[in-house]
């Protein structure tokens, strides 16, 4: 497992900081907590490709259809300034879709923008159960209580100390 504090400091915070210049509500403490909890639950901060040969990739387990929708409809068509902020993290000469598994800055940005499209506001920072419910309702295809409990458990074991 990548140490959660390193993932937070070197992946999540730089991306959210760049986004925060364009749209301040994209970089909040609650957003940092949501993103770290999401990566912990989705991949255990270790799997770049989905277990059991599914299509999702990156520490945030983003499926190609989700990437395409966020990239084309949310970034390119409606938020070019946000696209420019995310562009700082792209590798030149490689199509963005082909970078998703290995470029965790890009994956973090796509995941955060995916959450941003939700009209319901983020729960408060420190509301771990609320963040887990938010993940279950807006990132997962099914809001399964056992999965949300596991999100909370992983967060409490691996991420809580990052925010003290």
Model-flagged regions — what are they?
Residues 1-24, 133, 137, 144-145, ...:
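Ser/Thr/Pro-rich, acidic low-complexity intrinsically disordered regulatory segments
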Residues 18, 22, 41, 114-118, ...:
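Structured segments of extracytoplasmic/periplasmic soluble domains
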Residues 75, 147-155:
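Short, polar loop/linker segments at the starts of domains and inter-domain junctions
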Residues 101-109, 125-129, 145:
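Short, amphipathic alpha-helical segments
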């Amino acid at each position: 497992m990548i140490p959660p504090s390193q993932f937070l400091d070197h992946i999540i915070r730089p991306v959210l900081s760049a986004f925060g210049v364009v749209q301040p509500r994209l970089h909040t403490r609650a957003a940092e907590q949501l993103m770290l909890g999401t990566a912990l639950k989705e991949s255990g901060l270790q799997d770049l490709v989905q277990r059991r040969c599914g299509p999702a990739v990156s520490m945030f387990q983003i499926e190609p259809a989700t990437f395409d929708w966020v990239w084309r409809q949310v970034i390119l068509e409606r938020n070019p300034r946000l696209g420019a902020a995310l562009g700082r993290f792209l590798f030149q000469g490689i199509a963005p879709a082909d970078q998703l598994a290995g470029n965790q800055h890009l994956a973090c940005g796509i995941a955060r923008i995916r959450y941003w499209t939700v009209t319901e506001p983020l729960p408060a920072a420190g509301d771990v159960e609320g963040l887990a419910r938010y993940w279950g309702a807006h990132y997962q295809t099914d809001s399964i209580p056992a999965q949300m409990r596991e999100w909370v458990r992983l967060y409490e074991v691996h991420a809580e100390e990052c925010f003290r």
